[in-house]
Protein backbone atom coordinates (compact mmCIF):
# COMPACT_ATOMS: atom_id res chain seq x y z
CA UNK A 1 0.00 0.00 0.00
CA UNK A 2 1.46 3.33 -1.04
CA UNK A 3 1.61 6.03 1.62
CA UNK A 4 1.69 9.76 1.12
CA UNK A 5 1.49 12.85 3.30
CA UNK A 6 -0.87 15.80 3.48
CA UNK A 7 0.67 18.97 2.02
CA UNK A 8 -2.30 21.37 1.93
CA UNK A 9 -5.77 21.65 3.51
CA UNK A 10 -8.44 24.04 2.19
CA UNK A 11 -11.69 23.30 4.00
CA UNK A 12 -13.10 20.05 2.61
CA UNK A 13 -10.34 19.73 -0.02
CA UNK A 14 -6.97 18.19 0.85
CA UNK A 15 -3.82 17.83 -1.28
CA UNK A 16 -1.72 14.71 -0.66
CA UNK A 17 1.77 14.04 -2.00
CA UNK A 18 2.72 10.48 -3.01
CA UNK A 19 5.90 9.04 -4.53
CA UNK A 20 5.83 9.62 -8.31
CA UNK A 21 5.74 5.86 -8.95
CA UNK A 22 2.70 5.24 -6.70
CA UNK A 23 0.21 8.00 -7.51
CA UNK A 24 -3.40 6.93 -6.71
CA UNK A 25 -6.03 6.81 -9.46
CA UNK A 26 -9.01 9.18 -9.58
CA UNK A 27 -11.81 7.98 -7.20
CA UNK A 28 -9.39 5.89 -5.12
CA UNK A 29 -10.14 5.97 -1.40
CA UNK A 30 -7.30 7.05 0.91
CA UNK A 31 -7.30 6.36 4.66
CA UNK A 32 -5.88 8.99 7.00
CA UNK A 33 -3.62 7.50 9.68
CA UNK A 34 -3.72 8.74 13.30
CA UNK A 35 -7.27 10.15 13.05
CA UNK A 36 -9.44 9.20 16.05
CA UNK A 37 -12.37 8.22 13.80
CA UNK A 38 -12.16 6.58 10.38
CA UNK A 39 -11.44 9.39 7.92
CA UNK A 40 -11.46 8.71 4.18
CA UNK A 41 -10.35 10.97 1.33
CA UNK A 42 -11.53 10.46 -2.25
CA UNK A 43 -9.12 11.40 -5.06
CA UNK A 44 -10.65 13.93 -7.47
CA UNK A 45 -7.69 15.31 -9.45
CA UNK A 46 -4.05 14.51 -10.18
CA UNK A 47 -2.11 17.78 -10.07
CA UNK A 48 1.27 16.45 -11.24
CA UNK A 49 4.46 16.02 -9.25
CA UNK A 50 2.89 13.13 -7.30
CA UNK A 51 0.27 15.42 -5.73
CA UNK A 52 -3.43 14.46 -5.77
CA UNK A 53 -6.37 16.66 -4.75
CA UNK A 54 -9.02 14.91 -2.67
CA UNK A 55 -12.34 15.63 -1.00
CA UNK A 56 -12.76 14.65 2.64
CA UNK A 57 -15.56 12.20 3.52
CA UNK A 58 -16.00 13.71 6.96
CA UNK A 59 -14.81 16.70 8.93
CA UNK A 60 -11.33 18.06 8.23
CA UNK A 61 -11.15 19.57 11.74
CA UNK A 62 -7.91 18.59 13.46
CA UNK A 63 -6.16 17.52 10.23
CA UNK A 64 -2.67 18.93 9.80
CA UNK A 65 0.07 18.94 7.18
CA UNK A 66 2.50 16.05 7.30
CA UNK A 67 -0.05 13.45 8.44
CA UNK A 68 0.39 10.09 6.72
CA UNK A 69 -2.25 8.85 4.28
CA UNK A 70 -2.57 5.27 2.96
CA UNK A 71 -3.94 4.46 -0.50
CA UNK A 72 -6.46 1.58 -0.39
CA UNK A 73 -6.06 1.10 -4.15
CA UNK A 74 -9.84 0.94 -4.71
CA UNK A 75 -12.84 3.30 -4.65
CA UNK A 76 -15.02 3.69 -1.54
CA UNK A 77 -16.80 0.38 -0.96
CA UNK A 78 -19.96 -0.04 1.09
CA UNK A 79 -21.77 -3.07 2.56
CA UNK A 80 -24.62 -4.48 0.45
CA UNK A 81 -27.16 -7.24 0.83
CA UNK A 82 -29.73 -8.19 3.45
CA UNK A 83 -27.45 -7.24 6.38
CA UNK A 84 -28.08 -3.55 5.55
CA UNK A 85 -31.86 -3.87 6.09
CA UNK A 86 -33.23 -2.08 9.15
CA UNK A 87 -29.96 -0.20 9.63
CA UNK A 88 -28.89 3.45 9.31
CA UNK A 89 -25.56 4.01 7.60
CA UNK A 90 -23.42 6.95 6.60
CA UNK A 91 -21.75 7.62 3.25
CA UNK A 92 -18.99 5.06 3.97
CA UNK A 93 -21.48 2.34 4.92
CA UNK A 94 -20.59 2.55 8.63
CA UNK A 95 -23.50 2.02 11.03
CA UNK A 96 -24.66 5.21 12.77
CA UNK A 97 -27.63 3.72 14.67
CA UNK A 98 -25.50 2.51 17.64
CA UNK A 99 -26.49 -1.11 17.00
CA UNK A 100 -23.05 -2.52 16.23
CA UNK A 101 -21.29 -3.34 12.96
CA UNK A 102 -23.23 -4.08 9.77
CA UNK A 103 -21.28 -7.31 9.26
CA UNK A 104 -22.11 -7.69 5.56
CA UNK A 105 -20.28 -10.43 3.66
CA UNK A 106 -19.99 -8.34 0.51
CA UNK A 107 -18.78 -4.83 -0.32
CA UNK A 108 -19.59 -2.96 -3.54
CA UNK A 109 -17.78 0.06 -4.97
CA UNK A 110 -20.00 3.18 -5.04
CA UNK A 111 -18.69 4.04 -8.54
CA UNK A 112 -20.22 1.55 -10.94
CA UNK A 113 -21.07 1.66 -14.65
CA UNK A 114 -24.73 2.08 -15.62
CA UNK A 115 -26.43 -1.03 -17.08
CA UNK A 116 -25.84 -1.42 -20.81
CA UNK A 117 -28.57 -0.77 -23.35
CA UNK A 118 -29.15 -4.54 -23.83
CA UNK A 119 -29.62 -5.13 -20.08
CA UNK A 120 -32.28 -2.45 -19.61
CA UNK A 121 -35.99 -3.23 -19.66
CA UNK A 122 -39.02 -1.11 -20.46
CA UNK A 123 -41.62 -0.45 -17.78
CA UNK A 124 -45.30 -0.01 -18.54
CA UNK A 125 -46.88 -1.68 -15.49
CA UNK A 126 -48.66 0.97 -13.43
CA UNK A 127 -47.94 1.53 -9.75
CA UNK A 128 -51.02 2.59 -7.77
CA UNK A 129 -50.24 5.15 -5.05
CA UNK A 130 -53.66 5.71 -3.46
CA UNK A 131 -53.24 9.48 -3.97
CA UNK A 132 -56.06 10.64 -6.27
CA UNK A 133 -54.29 13.48 -8.08
CA UNK A 134 -51.19 11.36 -8.79
CA UNK A 135 -53.05 8.25 -9.96
CA UNK A 136 -55.30 10.35 -12.20
CA UNK A 137 -53.00 13.01 -13.70
CA UNK A 138 -49.44 11.66 -13.48
CA UNK A 139 -49.58 7.88 -12.96
CA UNK A 140 -46.34 6.17 -11.90
CA UNK A 141 -44.76 3.21 -13.68
CA UNK A 142 -43.22 0.30 -11.84
CA UNK A 143 -39.51 0.67 -12.50
CA UNK A 144 -39.92 4.34 -13.45
CA UNK A 145 -38.33 7.54 -12.15
CA UNK A 146 -40.54 10.03 -10.38
CA UNK A 147 -39.65 13.57 -9.30
CA UNK A 148 -41.45 15.66 -6.67
CA UNK A 149 -40.73 19.31 -7.49
CA UNK A 150 -41.50 22.13 -5.10
CA UNK A 151 -40.18 25.22 -3.34
CA UNK A 152 -39.55 25.48 0.39
CA UNK A 153 -42.39 24.38 2.66
CA UNK A 154 -44.89 23.27 -0.01
CA UNK A 155 -44.94 19.60 1.02
CA UNK A 156 -42.24 17.58 -0.80
CA UNK A 157 -41.21 15.58 2.25
CA UNK A 158 -44.81 14.99 3.42
CA UNK A 159 -45.76 13.74 -0.06
CA UNK A 160 -42.68 11.53 -0.15
CA UNK A 161 -43.51 10.10 3.31
CA UNK A 162 -47.10 9.40 2.17
CA UNK A 163 -45.80 7.61 -0.94
CA UNK A 164 -43.45 5.56 1.25
CA UNK A 165 -46.42 4.77 3.51
CA UNK A 166 -48.72 3.82 0.62
CA UNK A 167 -46.26 2.08 -1.70
CA UNK A 168 -43.52 0.66 0.54
CA UNK A 169 -45.90 -0.66 3.19
CA UNK A 170 -48.29 -2.26 0.67
CA UNK A 171 -45.38 -3.36 -1.53
CA UNK A 172 -43.79 -6.64 -0.47
CA UNK A 173 -40.38 -5.70 -1.88
CA UNK A 174 -37.47 -3.82 -0.35
CA UNK A 175 -36.81 -0.10 -0.09
CA UNK A 176 -33.69 2.04 0.22
CA UNK A 177 -33.99 5.55 1.63
CA UNK A 178 -31.17 8.02 0.90
CA UNK A 179 -31.32 11.22 2.96
CA UNK A 180 -29.14 13.63 0.98
CA UNK A 181 -28.44 16.89 2.79
CA UNK A 182 -31.80 17.04 4.57
CA UNK A 183 -32.66 17.78 8.21
CA UNK A 184 -31.47 15.30 10.85
CA UNK A 185 -34.85 15.65 12.60
CA UNK A 186 -36.63 14.35 9.48
CA UNK A 187 -34.27 11.37 9.31
CA UNK A 188 -34.92 10.59 12.97
CA UNK A 189 -38.71 10.92 12.56
CA UNK A 190 -38.59 8.67 9.50
CA UNK A 191 -36.65 5.98 11.40
CA UNK A 192 -39.17 5.94 14.27
CA UNK A 193 -42.16 5.95 11.90
CA UNK A 194 -40.69 2.97 10.06
CA UNK A 195 -40.30 1.15 13.40
CA UNK A 196 -43.93 1.82 14.32
CA UNK A 197 -45.06 0.60 10.90
CA UNK A 198 -43.05 -2.61 11.32
CA UNK A 199 -40.89 -1.91 8.26
CA UNK A 200 -37.85 -1.71 10.56
CA UNK A 201 -37.70 -4.63 13.00
CA UNK A 202 -35.01 -4.07 15.65
CA UNK A 203 -35.42 -7.50 17.31
CA UNK A 204 -35.19 -9.36 13.99
CA UNK A 205 -33.29 -7.05 11.58
CA UNK A 206 -33.45 -9.64 8.79
CA UNK A 207 -37.25 -9.12 8.65
CA UNK A 208 -36.83 -5.39 8.00
CA UNK A 209 -37.82 -4.03 4.59
CA UNK A 210 -35.79 -0.80 4.35
CA UNK A 211 -32.12 0.26 4.43
CA UNK A 212 -31.37 3.90 5.30
CA UNK A 213 -28.35 5.96 4.27
CA UNK A 214 -28.01 9.47 5.68
CA UNK A 215 -25.71 12.36 4.80
CA UNK A 216 -27.39 15.25 6.54
CA UNK A 217 -27.31 19.05 6.14
CA UNK A 218 -24.60 19.57 8.77
CA UNK A 219 -22.13 17.21 7.10
CA UNK A 220 -19.26 18.28 4.82
CA UNK A 221 -19.96 18.53 1.06
CA UNK A 222 -18.03 15.31 0.30
CA UNK A 223 -20.54 13.26 2.32
CA UNK A 224 -23.56 14.94 0.74
CA UNK A 225 -22.12 14.48 -2.76
CA UNK A 226 -21.52 10.75 -2.37
CA UNK A 227 -24.36 9.59 -0.10
CA UNK A 228 -26.81 9.30 -3.04
CA UNK A 229 -24.34 6.92 -4.74
CA UNK A 230 -24.05 4.87 -1.53
CA UNK A 231 -27.83 4.43 -1.33
CA UNK A 232 -28.06 3.67 -5.05
CA UNK A 233 -25.32 1.01 -4.79
CA UNK A 234 -27.33 -0.82 -2.12
CA UNK A 235 -30.47 -0.62 -4.28
CA UNK A 236 -28.56 -1.92 -7.33
CA UNK A 237 -27.45 -4.99 -5.39
CA UNK A 238 -31.05 -5.85 -4.46
CA UNK A 239 -32.12 -5.28 -8.09
CA UNK A 240 -29.36 -7.57 -9.39
CA UNK A 241 -30.68 -10.31 -7.07
CA UNK A 242 -33.93 -10.15 -9.05
CA UNK A 243 -35.97 -8.08 -6.60
CA UNK A 244 -38.19 -5.05 -7.16
CA UNK A 245 -36.69 -2.18 -5.18
CA UNK A 246 -38.03 1.23 -4.22
CA UNK A 247 -35.39 3.96 -3.98
CA UNK A 248 -36.36 7.17 -2.19
CA UNK A 249 -34.00 10.15 -2.45
CA UNK A 250 -34.64 13.28 -0.40
CA UNK A 251 -33.29 15.64 -1.80
CA UNK A 252 -31.64 15.59 -5.25
CA UNK A 253 -31.08 19.36 -5.17
CA UNK A 254 -28.72 18.99 -2.17
CA UNK A 255 -26.70 16.51 -4.23
CA UNK A 256 -26.29 19.20 -6.90
CA UNK A 257 -25.49 21.81 -4.27
CA UNK A 258 -22.78 19.63 -2.70
CA UNK A 259 -21.30 19.24 -6.20
CA UNK A 260 -21.28 23.02 -6.55
CA UNK A 261 -19.41 23.43 -3.24
CA UNK A 262 -16.85 20.75 -4.13
CA UNK A 263 -16.41 22.15 -7.65
CA UNK A 264 -15.60 25.61 -6.29
CA UNK A 265 -13.12 24.18 -3.78
CA UNK A 266 -11.44 22.19 -6.58
CA UNK A 267 -10.94 25.47 -8.45
CA UNK A 268 -13.25 24.91 -11.42
CA UNK A 269 -14.85 27.90 -13.13
CA UNK A 270 -18.57 28.12 -12.30
CA UNK A 271 -21.18 28.07 -15.08
CA UNK A 272 -24.76 29.48 -15.12
CA UNK A 273 -26.08 30.74 -11.74
CA UNK A 274 -22.85 29.59 -10.06
CA UNK A 275 -23.42 25.86 -10.63
CA UNK A 276 -20.55 23.50 -11.44
CA UNK A 277 -19.66 23.23 -15.16
CA UNK A 278 -20.15 19.44 -14.91
CA UNK A 279 -23.76 19.71 -13.62
CA UNK A 280 -25.40 17.74 -16.47
CA UNK A 281 -22.71 15.05 -16.38
CA UNK A 282 -22.89 14.59 -12.58
CA UNK A 283 -26.68 14.33 -12.73
CA UNK A 284 -26.42 11.88 -15.63
CA UNK A 285 -23.92 9.64 -13.81
CA UNK A 286 -26.40 9.24 -10.94
CA UNK A 287 -29.64 9.06 -12.93
CA UNK A 288 -28.40 6.65 -15.62
CA UNK A 289 -27.69 4.07 -12.92
CA UNK A 290 -31.23 4.34 -11.52
CA UNK A 291 -32.81 2.01 -14.04
CA UNK A 292 -34.58 -1.32 -14.35
CA UNK A 293 -32.89 -4.33 -15.91
CA UNK A 294 -34.14 -7.71 -17.05
CA UNK A 295 -33.24 -9.08 -13.59
CA UNK A 296 -35.19 -6.66 -11.40
CA UNK A 297 -36.53 -3.13 -11.15
CA UNK A 298 -35.66 0.08 -9.31
CA UNK A 299 -38.60 2.45 -8.92
CA UNK A 300 -37.24 5.75 -7.67
CA UNK A 301 -39.05 8.66 -6.05
CA UNK A 302 -36.88 11.78 -5.80
CA UNK A 303 -37.71 15.03 -4.06
CA UNK A 304 -36.32 18.04 -5.94
CA UNK A 305 -36.12 21.41 -4.20
CA UNK A 306 -36.89 24.27 -6.59
CA UNK A 307 -34.88 27.39 -5.65
CA UNK A 308 -37.09 30.50 -5.45
CA UNK A 309 -39.94 28.49 -7.07
CA UNK A 310 -38.15 28.82 -10.42
CA UNK A 311 -38.49 25.61 -12.45
CA UNK A 312 -36.10 27.02 -15.08
CA UNK A 313 -33.21 27.07 -12.57
CA UNK A 314 -30.40 24.84 -14.00
CA UNK A 315 -30.64 22.27 -11.19
CA UNK A 316 -34.35 21.28 -11.46
CA UNK A 317 -34.22 21.84 -15.25
CA UNK A 318 -31.39 19.27 -15.56
CA UNK A 319 -33.32 16.79 -13.40
CA UNK A 320 -36.49 17.04 -15.54
CA UNK A 321 -34.79 15.38 -18.52
CA UNK A 322 -34.27 12.09 -16.64
CA UNK A 323 -37.75 11.52 -15.21
CA UNK A 324 -40.77 9.49 -16.34
CA UNK A 325 -43.25 11.37 -14.16
CA UNK A 326 -43.01 14.84 -12.63
CA UNK A 327 -45.19 15.88 -9.71
CA UNK A 328 -45.08 19.68 -9.40
CA UNK A 329 -46.14 21.26 -6.10
CA UNK A 330 -47.58 24.77 -6.34
CA UNK A 331 -47.37 27.42 -3.63
CA UNK A 332 -50.63 29.08 -4.78
CA UNK A 333 -52.55 25.83 -4.28
CA UNK A 334 -50.97 25.44 -0.82
CA UNK A 335 -51.94 29.07 -0.01
CA UNK A 336 -55.59 28.18 -0.76
CA UNK A 337 -55.35 25.42 1.86
CA UNK A 338 -55.73 22.64 -0.73
CA UNK A 339 -53.41 19.74 0.15
CA UNK A 340 -51.67 17.86 -1.40
CA UNK A 341 -50.66 21.05 -3.26
CA UNK A 342 -49.99 19.16 -6.50
CA UNK A 343 -50.58 21.21 -9.64
CA UNK A 344 -52.70 19.09 -12.04
CA UNK A 345 -51.87 21.39 -14.98
CA UNK A 346 -48.10 21.30 -14.47
CA UNK A 347 -47.59 17.66 -13.46
CA UNK A 348 -46.89 15.19 -16.26
CA UNK A 349 -46.29 11.50 -16.84
CA UNK A 350 -45.18 9.44 -19.81
CA UNK A 351 -47.64 6.79 -18.66
CA UNK A 352 -50.67 9.03 -19.33
CA UNK A 353 -51.20 7.44 -22.72
CA UNK A 354 -54.34 5.59 -23.87
CA UNK A 355 -52.18 2.57 -24.79
CA UNK A 356 -50.90 2.31 -21.20
CA UNK A 357 -53.69 3.54 -18.91
CA UNK A 358 -56.65 2.88 -21.21
CA UNK A 359 -58.93 5.29 -23.07
CA UNK A 360 -61.33 5.87 -20.14
CA UNK A 361 -58.56 6.95 -17.75
CA UNK A 362 -56.91 9.13 -20.41
CA UNK A 363 -60.17 10.92 -21.32
CA UNK A 364 -61.04 11.52 -17.65
CA UNK A 365 -57.60 12.97 -16.87
CA UNK A 366 -57.63 15.24 -19.93
CA UNK A 367 -61.21 16.30 -19.17
CA UNK A 368 -60.20 17.32 -15.65
CA UNK A 369 -57.24 19.29 -17.02
CA UNK A 370 -59.38 21.04 -19.67
CA UNK A 371 -61.97 22.07 -17.07
CA UNK A 372 -59.28 23.43 -14.71
CA UNK A 373 -57.50 25.22 -17.57
CA UNK A 374 -60.75 26.91 -18.67
CA UNK A 375 -61.41 28.00 -15.06
CA UNK A 376 -57.88 29.42 -14.89
CA UNK A 377 -58.57 31.49 -18.03
CA UNK A 378 -61.92 32.72 -16.65
CA UNK A 379 -60.42 33.83 -13.32
CA UNK A 380 -59.28 37.17 -14.77
CA UNK A 381 -62.76 37.92 -16.12
CA UNK A 382 -64.34 36.95 -12.78
CA UNK A 383 -61.87 39.19 -10.90
CA UNK A 384 -62.83 42.23 -13.04
CA UNK A 385 -66.51 41.71 -13.92
CA UNK A 386 -67.73 39.12 -11.41
CA UNK A 387 -69.53 35.80 -11.97
CA UNK A 388 -72.76 37.39 -13.26
CA UNK A 389 -71.17 38.39 -16.59
CA UNK A 390 -70.31 34.78 -17.49
CA UNK A 391 -72.40 32.67 -19.86
CA UNK A 392 -74.38 29.75 -18.36
CA UNK A 393 -71.93 27.20 -19.79
CA UNK A 394 -68.95 29.08 -18.29
CA UNK A 395 -70.71 29.29 -14.91
CA UNK A 396 -71.14 25.52 -15.04
CA UNK A 397 -67.42 25.07 -15.90
CA UNK A 398 -66.43 27.26 -12.92
CA UNK A 399 -68.71 25.35 -10.53
CA UNK A 400 -67.36 21.98 -11.69
CA UNK A 401 -63.73 23.16 -11.66
CA UNK A 402 -64.07 24.37 -8.05
CA UNK A 403 -65.49 20.98 -7.07
CA UNK A 404 -62.69 19.20 -8.94
CA UNK A 405 -60.06 21.36 -7.15
CA UNK A 406 -61.53 20.37 -3.80
CA UNK A 407 -61.99 16.72 -4.74
CA UNK A 408 -58.28 16.54 -5.65
CA UNK A 409 -57.49 17.05 -1.93
CA UNK A 410 -57.34 14.16 0.49
CA UNK A 411 -56.25 13.48 4.08
CA UNK A 412 -52.83 11.82 4.39
CA UNK A 413 -51.88 9.04 6.80
CA UNK A 414 -48.61 10.77 7.67
CA UNK A 415 -50.39 14.08 8.38
CA UNK A 416 -52.91 12.44 10.73
CA UNK A 417 -50.94 13.53 13.81
CA UNK A 418 -51.21 17.20 12.73
CA UNK A 419 -54.73 17.33 11.28
CA UNK A 420 -56.57 14.76 13.37
CA UNK A 421 -58.23 13.41 10.20
CA UNK A 422 -57.57 9.73 9.45
CA UNK A 423 -55.67 9.23 6.17
CA UNK A 424 -57.31 7.52 3.20
CA UNK A 425 -55.97 5.30 0.43
CA UNK A 426 -58.15 5.74 -2.68
CA UNK A 427 -58.08 2.90 -5.25
CA UNK A 428 -57.69 4.01 -8.87
CA UNK A 429 -61.13 2.77 -9.98
CA UNK A 430 -62.77 4.87 -7.22
CA UNK A 431 -60.76 7.92 -8.33
CA UNK A 432 -61.88 7.47 -11.94
CA UNK A 433 -65.52 6.91 -10.92
CA UNK A 434 -65.55 10.15 -8.91
CA UNK A 435 -63.96 12.40 -11.54
CA UNK A 436 -65.95 10.85 -14.37
CA UNK A 437 -69.16 11.66 -12.50
CA UNK A 438 -68.00 15.22 -11.77
CA UNK A 439 -67.25 15.86 -15.45
CA UNK A 440 -70.60 14.36 -16.50
CA UNK A 441 -72.46 16.68 -14.10
CA UNK A 442 -73.79 13.88 -11.87
CA UNK A 443 -72.83 15.81 -8.73
CA UNK A 444 -73.74 19.35 -9.81
CA UNK A 445 -76.27 19.61 -6.97
CA UNK A 446 -73.71 18.83 -4.23
CA UNK A 447 -72.14 21.93 -2.58
CA UNK A 448 -68.39 22.34 -3.18
CA UNK A 449 -67.53 22.25 0.57
CA UNK A 450 -68.59 18.58 0.64
CA UNK A 451 -65.65 17.66 -1.63
CA UNK A 452 -62.93 19.03 0.69
CA UNK A 453 -60.61 16.39 2.17
CA UNK A 454 -62.67 13.33 1.36
CA UNK A 455 -61.48 10.05 -0.13
CA UNK A 456 -64.06 8.56 -2.49
CA UNK A 457 -67.05 10.30 -4.07
CA UNK A 458 -69.33 8.40 -1.65
CA UNK A 459 -67.68 10.28 1.24
CA UNK A 460 -68.44 13.58 -0.52
CA UNK A 461 -72.12 12.57 -0.82
CA UNK A 462 -72.16 11.68 2.91
CA UNK A 463 -70.53 15.04 3.76
CA UNK A 464 -73.21 16.86 1.74
CA UNK A 465 -75.95 15.29 3.88
CA UNK A 466 -74.30 16.70 7.03
CA UNK A 467 -74.09 20.27 5.66
From Swiss-Prot:
* Annotated GO MF terms: ATP binding; ATP hydrolysis activity; proton-transporting ATP synthase activity, rotational mechanism
Q: Which UniProt keywords apply?
A: ATP synthesis, ATP-binding, Cell inner membrane, Cell membrane, CF(1), Hydrogen ion transport, Ion transport, Membrane, Nucleotide-binding, Translocase, Transport
Q: List ligand-binding residues for ATP.
A: 150-157
Q: Where in the cell is it found?
A: Cell inner membrane
First-tier enzyme category under EC:
translocase
Which residues are listed as membrane-spanning? none
Entry's Pfam families?
Answer: ATP-synt_ab, ATP-synt_ab_N, ATP-synt_VA_C
Q: Which GO terms describe its cellular component?
A: plasma membrane; proton-transporting ATP synthase complex
Q: Which EC number(s) are documented for this chain? A: 7.1.2.2
Reactions mediated catalytically: ATP + H2O + 4 H(+)(in) = ADP + phosphate + 5 H(+)(out)
Q: Which CDD domains match?
A: ATP-synt_F1_beta_C (cd18110), ATP-synt_F1_beta_N (cd18115), F1-ATPase_beta_CD (cd01133)
Topology of the protein relative to the lipid bilayer? Peripheral membrane protein
Summarizing the function annotation, the protein's role is: Produces ATP from ADP in the presence of a proton gradient across the membrane. The catalytic sites are hosted primarily by the beta subunits.
The record's note on quaternary structure and interaction partners says:
F-type ATPases have 2 components, CF(1) - the catalytic core - and CF(0) - the membrane proton channel. CF(1) has five subunits: alpha(3), beta(3), gamma(1), delta(1), epsilon(1). CF(0) has three main subunits: a(1), b(2) and c(9-12). The alpha and beta chains form an alternating ring which encloses part of the gamma chain. CF(1) is attached to CF(0) by a central stalk formed by the gamma and epsilon chains, while a peripheral stalk is formed by the delta and b chains.
Quote the PANTHER family the UniProt record gives: ATP SYNTHASE (PTHR15184), ATP SYNTHASE SUBUNIT BETA, MITOCHONDRIAL (PTHR15184:SF71)
What family does this belong to?
A: Belongs to the ATPase alpha/beta chains family.
Protein name in UniProt: ATP synthase subunit beta
Name of the coding gene: atpD
Amino acid sequence: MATGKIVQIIGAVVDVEFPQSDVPSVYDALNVKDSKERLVLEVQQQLGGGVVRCIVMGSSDGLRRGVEVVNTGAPISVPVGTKTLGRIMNVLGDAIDERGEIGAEELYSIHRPAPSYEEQSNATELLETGVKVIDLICPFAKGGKIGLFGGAGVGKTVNMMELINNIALQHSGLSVFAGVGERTREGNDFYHEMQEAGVVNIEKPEESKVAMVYGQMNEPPGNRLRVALTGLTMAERFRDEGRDVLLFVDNIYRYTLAGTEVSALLGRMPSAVGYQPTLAEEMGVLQERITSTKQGSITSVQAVYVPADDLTDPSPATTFAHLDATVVLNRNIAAMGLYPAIDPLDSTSRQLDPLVVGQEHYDTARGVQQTLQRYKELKDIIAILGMDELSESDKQVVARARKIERFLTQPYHVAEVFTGDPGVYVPLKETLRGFKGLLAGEYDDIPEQAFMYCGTIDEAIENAKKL
